[in-house]
Amino acid sequence: MRTDLGDGHAVVDLCEAALDDADRLVPKVRIMAMQQQAHGASLAGERGLVDQLIDQADRLLPSVDDDLPWGNACRRTPGYLEVQRATCYGRLGLGAEAGALWSQVLALVPETARRDRGVYMARQATAAAAAREPDQAVEIARSAATIAVETRSARMRRELVTLERTMRPWQDAPVGRDLAEILGPVTEGS
């Protein structure tokens, strides 16, 4: 919840407290705490800490071997930790780096995982806009918007609203008008 509120320092503090006695935690819980701490670090503008935490979590990933039914996204989701890194990079304003990671992640995510693919594409489009590549952002947004309309995903809609904000510098340009037309069906009735 502190991440959603943009309180990076509180997220880092909470995760540090959770990891204070990390040896007593199963690897899956340590990975979850580390990736959440990375999100907090991204909110605080600390790229080095983001990379350090995601890299540490990645080294723990092979140790996740329990059969508990909760918290298995780190094993089940292709490129899970790179999804977290790309999200953090996007939050840090590292558009080119985030975009490259989203390309890698999307190559791993099956077409059947439509909601995840749509969210990731919306984030990739936002990364392109942040990297001052508005044409690329709009091209990616076309696919994400189609999925958003078909699935009615609120999460995807939120990501596309973020894209819309990031594209404001081009709102009066042809590319901005194209984006508004593409996103129209997504935001109808919202």
Task: Give the ranges of each region predicted by the language model.
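Conserved binding/catalytic microenvironments
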Residues: 1-190
